[in-house]
Amino acid sequence: FSNIVESILQEKDRTEMRKNISEKYIDACIIKGSDDTFHFAAPAKRPRELDEIPSPYLTGLMDKFFDGRLDPYIQASRGCPFKCTYCVDGSDLVTKVNRFCQGRLSKELEYIAKRVPKNIHTLGISDLNFGSYKGDLELCDMIAGIQKKYEYPRALYVQTGKNSKNNIIKVMKKLGDAVKLTMSVQSMDKSVLKNIKRDNISEEQMMELKPTIEESGLQTRTEVILGLPGDS
């Protein structure tokens, strides 16, 4: 969308603006031309240095949304190394995982905790495979510090990674019962998994984790998707 706006602002002749824009190839956009053909442009270029993107919290853009109805969300990383065909993030364009720096995340957590209304207890983390990386362990330490200082967040909403479960359990232990361990399978049918290009953690590995999960008192949940290719 920002690419379209930028192209519009570059137009000097407003009377011909619509016609000129419809004949352009604008990155990350599909445009219907004046001749009714579609122009497919190059995919969007992903920023490698995520900290170049201004923080919507630290710049004050999110202040009006601390309204007692919405849960704050932060993002520590972008990208996903997996290629599940049902997922928009399974594209080759986003397989590289990039992270925001820990200093920025620490400031965002402090900023949110100081402003979140008393009736809001949940913090969302919109990473695709939270707990799979070393930086996530450090982030959990920061969140634990914020919890001790502000008694927030009492609950975390995260999507934990489907592999490296032992590492994820170490991460989850730092946050106690504030977070649940997600062990999504999407399907247990091997032919369906092949169709959607997904490799689940093996059943043997899953069962090996059971004693550790019970000992730690972790809450768990799973997810399945109905109607995947080959389901019926």
Model-predicted regions and their roles:
Residues 21, 45-46, 97, 135:
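Generic detector of ordered secondary-structure context
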Residues 51-216, 226-228:
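Radical SAM [4Fe-4S] cluster-binding motif and immediate context
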Residues 44-47, 74:
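Walker A/P-loop phosphate-binding element recognition
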Residues 231:
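Catalytic palm subdomain of template-directed nucleic-acid polymerases
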Residues 1-45:
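Glycine-rich beta-alpha loop elements in corrinoid/cobalamin-binding modules
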